């Protein structure tokens, strides 16, 4: 029999076919239309198995093609570069935590369960919320789950979402609610301030079918929403649930969502000790205020404290009848092990920072991002499209097409911001962007603009 270079067990095919009562591979796959079958060997890699040395050589050749940047990337859009203390990496790399095992058996999982409980407690304190679950996939999935949760609770079908919320999160929501009959209605934002347009909010909320109202703080443009408490009041008046999406890191500067009585809070823990890795893995945050009608409809897992038969305190998964332990169609979600390891990373990071460290870090980011915006707008004909206060991310409008600027930055081994329109880009500046890096970005852009305008 022909020996396939990748599959060592081809000589067992006849034996396996005989065992299942099938005469040939063609018969086994006869439900697949012939016109879409490939009846040839695929041209995979080098066409043969490689030795360990050859594999290592091949990988090293590819690694050499990577471009080493002169400065940390200036692109964010909700996923931003930060310094991660080595102790975070060390602790989550321990075998007790570095596992995909779900702690169904509390008698052998006390360490993992306690670590997740500590995450929940720290995040609850940071958000000023009562109940936090043990993690979600990311901000987008947490928001989608919040929308579905609101629909389960009140049965209404319309959710108001700001135009200035993260567009990637909105795409996730639209995907998740497909087939559910839930409608997303977008609320405009003020083109001068970048904040939510309250007049349009009043207009769009003037119906009885509002299930929830969502607002992001800071919004996608990095701008603080100064009227967020008014949005919460509108939701209460319409008997809808309020959903607040918040960057947890920004809470070193602004009021937490629990202080203005948000019903549901979502976010992402990426900026609390998680690296950049082609956009993942991320760590969704999900919290609610103390109301059992909310708690029992929460997605994901919740770790709680109980006592064993001897009266000794212990940790265990609680309210499990909400989750995948019951019939799938009755479960609030089926999110399984999700991002437990990254929740522990968040807990370690927050423990290391403490309250004062969090305040110092957010202030440092605030001042560095404002310094960068100031230096960029000192370039002739460069401006900020929005006049409101911002944190970490900010939009810049250029007199020439941003694609030209972006290409020049790449030539200089700099990663610019996210393109918002032909002439506008969203930049991100954090504690890892020192003055030298920011000044290099500014001088490169200034050189590019001056060169175009004088040519």
UniProtKB/Swiss-Prot annotation:
EC number: 1.4.4.2
Pfam families reported in the protein's UniProt record: GDC-P (PF02347)
GO biological process: one example: nucleoside metabolic process
UniProt GO molecular function: glycine dehydrogenase (decarboxylating) activity
First-tier enzyme category under EC: oxidoreductase
Keywords of the record: Oxidoreductase
Its biological purpose: The glycine cleavage system catalyzes the degradation of glycine. The P protein binds the alpha-amino group of glycine through its pyridoxal phosphate cofactor; CO(2) is released and the remaining methylamine moiety is then transferred to the lipoamide cofactor of the H protein.
Subunit structure of this chain's protein: The glycine cleavage system is composed of four proteins: P, T, L and H. In this organism, the P 'protein' is a heterodimer of two subunits.
Entry protein name: Probable glycine dehydrogenase (decarboxylating) subunit 1
Species per Swiss-Prot/TrEMBL record: Saccharolobus islandicus (strain Y.G.57.14 / Yellowstone #1) (Sulfolobus islandicus)
GN (gene name): gcvPA
